[in-house]
A protein has these predicted regions:
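Auxiliary, metal-adjacent structural segments of Zn-dependent hydrolase domains
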Residues: 1-58
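An active-site-proximal "capping" alpha-helix that borders the catalytic cofactor pocket
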Residues: 26, 118-131
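Sec-exported extracytoplasmic/periplasmic mature domains
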Residues: 27-32, 85-90, 129-136
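Short pre-active-site segment immediately N-terminal to the catalytic Zn-binding motif
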Residues: 65-81
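Active-site recognition of the HExxH zinc-binding catalytic motif
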Residues: 77-95
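Pan-zinc metallopeptidase signature
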Residues: 128-186
């Protein structure tokens, strides 16, 4: 069961229900349910980060999503979903995939991360693109793919293709999904 804790400051301006709905969207993309995962998700503000950014801190089944919404832009629900994807993937699939390594082109800021972390980053970005493309249209998806390539995630079109095919299977995301993806990339 996932336990959600939304900070009072965020509850004031943004309904807790909206957070729950965004979390449910992510679970649906993974073909999971709330009771498939045991973890705690805390969401709070952190004004020490650049405006408009977000990140997640992972500690033994407890995940803290830190947000610094930009006052001039809409609330970053896409960032909330992105960080939630990371939280639940780390909680449910603990494998480091250490026997697998293939070269993944990544931006310099990601080069200190493990293969598993970088593979997961690609997965989260591809799932976000598919989700938001369904919502915002094909052109939006194409622009986002181009943006991700420009950022250094040059294999993102391959990941999007894999996850489009995987979503048709209706299978739950699992360690096997990671392994299938690795073979797909080879």
């Amino acid at each position: 069961m996932i336990r959600y804790k939304i900070s009072p400051a965020l509850q004031k301006n943004h309904k807790s229900r909206q957070f729950y709905l965004v979390f449910q969207e992510a679970l649906k993309m993974l073909n999971w349910k709330d009771n498939d995962i045991r973890c705690t998700i805390n969401v709070r503000l952190d004004f020490g980060m650049p405006a408009g950014s977000g990140r997640v801190i992972h500690r033994r089944g407890k995940h803290t999503i830190l947000l610094h919404p930009s006052p001039r832009k809409p609330f970053p629900w896409n960032t909330v979903r992105h960080e939630f994807f990371h939280s639940v993937l780390k909680s449910k699939i603990r494998s480091r995939l250490s026997k697998y390594t293939i070269p993944l082109p990544i931006p310099k800021s990601y080069q200190t991360q493990t293969f598993r972390e970088n593979l997961e980053e690609y997965c989260v970005r591809a799932l976000q693109i598919i989700f938001l493309q369904q919502k915002n249209g094909v052109q939006w998806g194409q622009k986002q793919v181009a943006h991700e390539i420009q950022q250094g995630f040059t294999l993102i079109p391959v990941f999007v293709k894999f996850f489009r095919q995987w979503r048709k299977t209706k299978r739950s995301f699992s360690r096997k999904t990671f392994v299938d993806l690795i073979y797909f990339l080879n």
